[in-house]
A protein has these predicted regions:
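Non-catalytic beta/alpha edge segments that cap or flank active sites
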Residues: 1-162
Length: 162
């Protein structure tokens, strides 16, 4: 599996805050045997998010793109809207599962607006901006990711044997 990680943070992009989530996600993915092909940190800018996601999908064609940051309700949190413009099909079960698991840890999880979806043959998942939240959310949906990617890429086998 090949992945890319996009961190969204105005403060990080200005050099005012170190990106801890992107590297934490990269380390976690590598431990799972995933090849992390690309990592980037950009500001919470709608057009820049859209163009980065589209460029990566068109040029790198990763199996998985994880975004981290910009999923809350602050005025500059626009990652779900930008992702929504990029995806062809939404996969609401990923966000539902992440919120379900996160609510066991914090009542603030209810304000997450993270989404997941497909563009071409790439799965895109929005994760929270904190390293802890990003990893916990990824762990919540990880069991479904390899199967989802196989199906997205055309695996004809049945989903569950009879």
């Amino acid at each position: 599996m090949r992945a890319a990680i996009l961190t969204l943070s105005d403060k990080g992009a200005r050099g005012e805050r170190e990106d801890l989530s992107g590297p934490a996600l990269s380390d976690w993915l590598i431990q799972q045997g995933v090849v992390v092909e690309c990592m980037s940190l950009i500001p919470d800018d709608f057009e820049q998010i859209v163009s980065t996601l589209e460029k990566w999908i068109d040029s790198l064609a990763p199996d998985l793109i994880l975004t981290t940051g910009g999923t809350g309700v602050s005025p500059r949190d626009i990652t779900p809207e930008a992702t929504g413009k990029v995806i062809d099909r939404e996969l609401p079960g990923f966000a539902e599962r992440m919120r379900q698991e996160s609510l066991k840890k914090t009542p603030h999880a209810i304000i997450s607006r993270a989404i997941a979806g497909i563009r071409h043959r790439t799965l895109i998942i929005n994760l929270p901006g904190s390293p802890k939240g990003a990893i916990e959310n990824l762990e919540a949906v990880w069991p479904a990711i390899p199967h989802a990617i196989a199906k997205i890429q055309g695996d004809p086998s049945d989903c569950s044997p009879l």
